[in-house]
A protein has these predicted regions:
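Conserved alpha/beta catalytic core and glycan-binding cleft of carbohydrate-active enzymes
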Residues: 1-54
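Short, glycine-/Ser/Thr-/acidic-enriched flexible segments
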Residues: 14, 48-50, 126, 136-139, ...
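Aromatic- and carboxylate-lined catalytic core of secreted/periplasmic carbohydrate-active enzymes
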Residues: 51-112
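Membrane engagement elements in two modes
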Residues: 72-75, 150, 175-177
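Carbohydrate-binding surface patches
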Residues: 94-148
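Beta-strand-rich binding/interaction modules
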Residues: 140-162
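C-terminal beta-strand-rich structural cap/linker in extracellular carbohydrate-active enzymes
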Residues: 162-184
């Protein structure tokens, strides 16, 4: 039906925790993916505090505040930017990736060819266009996207743009960066 949406999740009671299987860095990016891709995000019991056990009682006394804070920011960004919600469009954007040191040779990614750890896409509605970059790698990446964009990450509210040795602006991303696309 028109009013139905897919549920987006990375963990449930039948599977080992994503954080245990893939590590903290990939879990942070996957958590960001469920809030930036189309669909309804589902947070499984304790995922928002870094819970590691599958069917254990939620260990509130051992909550990882950094994980909880990150989920709070992702929820706030999704609420503040309807383009990330169910009515938002999802489109590809071309991008180039350099991990770690900006002097490294970039990996070209466009069309159906993607580096394993990074993906970039556009979410848009009639009011705004956002570029989302997800990095599942354990180290930060520098990503040049094929559209003009602002320099402030909406998740961290900090500048995320760096310039490489050739003068190319790149989005520096640990796990996720969401930036506004520049208006024409």
């Amino acid at each position: 039906p028109d009013h139905a949406e897919f549920l987006q999740y990375i963990e449930n009671h039948d599977e080992t925790r994503y954080r245990v299987e893939c590590g903290d860095d990939a879990a942070a990016a996957a958590g960001a993916a469920i809030f930036t891709l189309p669909g309804v995000p589902m947070i499984y019991a304790g995922q928002e505090i870094g819970q590691r056990g599958r069917r254990d009682a939620i260990a509130w006394d051992h909550a990882r505040e950094g994980v909880r804070d990150r989920y709070e920011r992702l929820i706030a960004v999704r609420e503040d930017h309807p383009a990330l919600g169910p009515e938002g469009n999802l489109d590809r954007v071309g991008y180039h990736v350099a991990s770690g040191d900006l002097s490294e040779r970039p990996i070209v990614a466009s069309g159906d060819v993607h580096p394993d750890d990074v993906v970039a896409f556009r979410r848009s509605d009639e009011d705004e266009q956002l570029v989302v970059v997800l990095n599942f790698a354990p180290e930060s990446a520098s990503v040049a996207v094929g559209v003009d964009h602002a320099d402030r990450d909406l998740v961290t509210d900090e500048s995320c743009v760096v310039v490489d040795g050739e003068g190319t602006e790149r989005i520096r991303v640990d796990d996720v960066a969401v930036v506004r696309e520049a208006e024409e």
